[in-house]
Amino acid sequence: MITVPHSRKVELDEIDRAILRLLQEDGRMSYSEISRRINVPESTVRARVNRLVKEGVIRKFAALINPFKAGYEIVAFIAVDAEPAKVKQVVEELAKFPEVDVLGIVTGAHDIFMQVTVKDLQELERFILEKMAKIDGIKSTETSILTSVKKWGYARVF
């Protein structure tokens, strides 16, 4: 589980940021290509990437998949209201479901917010009425379905 707001902040210099920007552009870019583009030795790039992984700045290297092209028609955002004493327990249970892409405790009108990706409306219904319904502590949910995508990004490096 990621605990971003309360994690120790890692100091990033311009070389770190340049490496991160290039890896976000193309996660398969070789260290030698990164080295060439930012004009530092390849050994520096390798050491920096290893440090960024070790310190948790780079969580993992993965392909960014377009869910719609991969046969998943529904991306939904679900706000959850939970019993105050059970919020953390509810989050731990929700985190176990493969349908959940992003999950966190939030401020505002709801306690928990998540993004889920499923193949169709029937699978979304099963997720809410069968899987989520079994979790003790959930009081109510509010679901919004993404109808179009204007931007699908990832964490920016300034």
Curated annotation (Swiss-Prot):
One of its GO terms (molecular function) is sequence-specific DNA binding. CDD domains: HTH_ARSR. It comes from the Archaea. The keyword Transcription applies. Residues 12-73 form the HTH asnC-type domain. Disulfide bonds: none annotated. Residues 31-50 bind DNA. One of its GO terms (biological process) is response to amino acid. One of its GO terms (cellular component) is cytosol. Keywords: DNA-binding, Transcription, Transcription regulation. This is Uncharacterized HTH-type transcriptional regulator PH0140. The lineage of its organism: Archaea, Methanobacteriati, Methanobacteriota, Thermococci, Thermococcales.
